[in-house]
Amino acid sequence: MANEGSDPLLQYMISPRLKKPPQLLFPLPEDNEVAIPMPMTPSEFKERLIFGPFSCSPRDSSHFIDSMKQPSPSSSSTAVNNPFSDSSTLDPLLPPPPPQPEPWLSDQTSSHCQGHALHRSKTAPAMAVINDLHHPIRQKDPTETSRSVVRQAFALLVVYLSLGVLIYWLNRDHYVVNQTHPVVDGLYFCIVTMCTIGYGDITPNSVVTKLFSIMFVLVGFGFIDILLSGMVSYVLDLQESYMLDSAKRRDEPEKRRSYIIDVKKGRMRIRLKVALALGVVVLCIAVGVGIMHFIEEIGWLDSFYLSVMSVTTVGYGDRAFKTLPGRLFAAIWLLVSTLAVARAFLYLAEARVDKRNRERAKKVLCETMSVSQFFAADIDNNGCVSKAEYVIYKLKEMEKITDKDILPISKQFDKLDRCSNGKITLLDLLEGGSGD
């Protein structure tokens, strides 16, 4: 019992209220004790912003331990007497000091906390959507945009044709024409002029009508472009999406579907687009042959001749529509067939360009890198070519991108890279958002 006075454990059990207040100076780290939480590193700060507080992190409190642990009188009295126990005195970015778990809980949680190295999954949603707070993105539905373009194109076409018919009706005596009905003749004249066919069966013979025809032709080119880029593209996109959905739903072999769908790009193959466009042109010619033979009462050969000359916008003028039903049909048929032919030529040009690009890409990927190509690919002139530099150089050789395409992207990167260290960090984005 001689050592009873010097035994600290026995003294604490006999008189716990006589315990000395905690020291204001904390033990050094070499004693394997840390009294205050260490400041977070940038990587831990980034993980905390994205994932939130980790349950097993030594800097954050464990919800599991807090729910299982019962508060003890000694710990509560220590928290009251400790002047540094108030978390409000700490930096708001630093988490509160972690509570000490019970011994029977420390063994179970140590295995989970040991070797903590979490990485954000690419498919995991962020707990704090930082980008939406500073840069809210308003996504527009592409379908609504396409529909608005179609409505605008249709409205402009109606205004264009209505104005043309009105001017023709007011000046119908100044045209050389085999008249049927003023409105039908005016609509027929407007369509033939806009589609640049020019049969020659209706011609102006005064100064006013000639000036009107000049203006009408020049404005008609713009309307053809609007119709091609608006209404026709919208209809063809709907057709393409419908065919893609139908091909995906069917239980067909992958090899058979690959002839229709480009699986890698998720679109119809260009050869199928060309075939469909040419099929529409052939259908327009066939419909024109039948209507001309039965309505205009001309022979099969002359019907086929006039149909081809009309669809291809040649229009020699030796044959034309003379009856009222024929001109009313031609007002619709010529517009549709002209747009179909124009789209077919666009698809043919796209097919040739696509074939040339595929051949060039195959040639570029098969050749090895020479010394001159190595120095050309070394963008930063550091004596080695990184993967990004190699990809950029190969894309340039394939003529998919140019320096003009890369320059605005580099300028945008320099704006985001506020530290000018060649990297964009989360702190740069936050500072950029607060600065904006």
From Swiss-Prot:
UniProt keyword Nucleotidyltransferase present: no
Role this protein plays: Two-pore potassium channel modulating the proton motive force (pmf) necessary to convert photochemical energy into physiological functions. Mediates the potassium efflux from the thylakoid lumen required for the regulation of the transmembrane electrical potential, the enhancement of the pH gradient for ATP synthesis, the regulation of electron flow, and pH-mediated photoprotective responses. Requires calcium for channel activity.
GO cellular component: chloroplast stromal thylakoid; plant-type vacuole membrane; potassium channel complex; vacuole
Membrane topology of this protein: Multi-pass membrane protein
Annotated region (Disordered), positions in chain: 62-117
Transmembrane segments: 149-169, 212-232, 275-295, 328-348
Alphabetized Pfam families for the sequence: Ion_trans_2
Cytoplasmic-side positions: 1-148, 233-274, 349-436
Binding sites annotated in the UniProt record for Ca(2+) 1: D378, D380, N382, C384, E389
Residues binding Ca(2+) 2: D417, N421, K423, D428
Keyword Acetylation: no
Localization per record: Vacuole membrane; Plastid, Chloroplast thylakoid membrane
Recorded GO MF terms: metal ion binding; potassium channel activity
Subunit structure: Homodimer.
Species annotation: Arabidopsis thaliana
Family affiliation: Belongs to the two pore domain potassium channel (TC 1.A.1.7) family.
Domain writeup: Each of the two pore-forming region (also called P-domain or P-loop) is enclosed by two transmembrane segments (2P/4TM) and contains the GYGD signature motif which seems to be involved in potassium selectivity. The C-terminus is not required for transport to the vacuolar membrane.
Tissue distribution: Expressed in roots, cotyledons, stems, hypocotyls, leaves and flowers. Detected in root tips and in mesophyll cells and guard cells of the leaves.
GO BP, sorted A to Z: cellular response to electrical stimulus; nonphotochemical quenching; potassium ion export across plasma membrane; potassium ion import across plasma membrane; potassium ion transmembrane transport; thylakoid membrane organization
Stored PANTHER family: POTASSIUM CHANNEL, SUBFAMILY K, TWO-PORE POTASSIUM CHANNEL 3
Name by which UniProt lists this protein: Two-pore potassium channel 3
Ranges of Low complexity composition bias in the record: 71-92
Disruption phenotype: RNAi-mediated knockdown of the protein causes no effects on germination or on plants grown under normal conditions, but decreases the rosette size, enhances the accumulation of anthocyans and desorganizes the photosynthetic membranes when the plants are grown under high light. No effect on photosynthetic performance.
